[in-house]
Design a protein with these regions (language model features):
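Catalytic Walker B motif of ABC-type/P-loop ATPase nucleotide-binding domains
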Residues: 149-153
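Conserved ABC ATPase signature
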Residues: 124-131
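Helix-to-loop junction immediately C-terminal to a conserved catalytic motif
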Residues: 48
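Conserved ABC ATPase "signature" region
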Residues: 93, 103-120
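Conserved ABC transporter NBD signature motif
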Residues: 55-69
């Protein structure tokens, strides 16, 4: 479970994220949806411990900054960061050792295969394209057998085959009872994945939707319902 309580992030006098609270339960895919600049990545980086913030973040009932929480928390950043001198496989093996993961050698072998990196395993971090680095980041996040997974704009830079594979991975994690949070502005890419959706605008969550409660409305209809002005000039709050 991932729980965010009154998360606020300021840069000087500018409020980037304003008292945001939400929860994603075990076995759910949560979508943090909004235009560029809405505050999605700031929330993601705060949850990941990359930014200082006010408020609270809980991972399976533990404080997000605790070592216990970090051991079960997989994170795929918007901009992947690689070790220049490590190969693709060495990245995965490094994560295994750093997290003391129980991932098997067979599972390590399978990860590059799933994301078409099998013939790239000996390439160094500084030899990888943006798309390949994104795939390695996903493999590393999966290598710890996470209970909570957070992905920031994960489909950007991926080829169609990798996007399809990533969607399958997300659904597999959901079936295993994992908590997944995806930050994106690409509605089409997540329309078949989500269980709960949080629509952001100007640093605030302006609407929350549960897929079980919205009848036959699709994700685009819901999003534009709350982000586009009403007829007659009125706007949704």
């Amino acid at each position: 479970m991932l729980e965010v309580q009154e998360l606020t992030k300021k840069y000087g006098k500018n409020v980037a994220v304003d008292h945001v609270s939400f929860m994603v339960q075990d076995g759910q895919v949560g979508i943090l949806l909004g235009p560029n600049g809405a505050g999605k990545s700031t929330i993601i980086k705060s949850i990941a411990g990359l930014l200082r913030y006010e408020g609270g973040v809980g991972i399976n009932g533990m404080k997000a900054r605790s070592l216990e929480a970090k051991k079960i928390f997989g994170y795929v950043p918007e901009i992947p960061a690689m070790f220049e001198a490590l190969t693709v496989r060495e990245h995965i093996e490094y994560v295994k050792r750093a997290y003391n993961s129980d991932i098997t050698e067979e599972e390590i072998d399978a990860l590059p295969t799933r994301f078409e990196l099998l013939d790239k395993q000996e390439k160094l971090g500084n030899e990888l394209s943006k798309g390949m680095m994104q795939k390695v980041s996903i493999c590393c996040a999966l290598a710890i057998h996470p209970k909570v997974v957070m992905l920031d704009e994960p489909m950007v830079g991926l080829d169609p085959a990798a996007i399809k594979e990533l969607k399958e991975v997300v659904l597999e994690l959901k079936e295993k009872g994992c908590t997944i949070l995806i930050s994106t502005h690409m509605l089409e890419m997540v329309k078949d994945l989500w269980d709960v959706m949080f629509v952001m605008e100007q640093g605030k969550i302006i609407a929350t939707f549960n897929k079980k409660e919205i009848a036959d409305k699709d994700i685009e209809e819901l999003f534009f319902e709350v982000t586009e002005p009403k007829t007659g000039g009125e706007e949704h709050e």
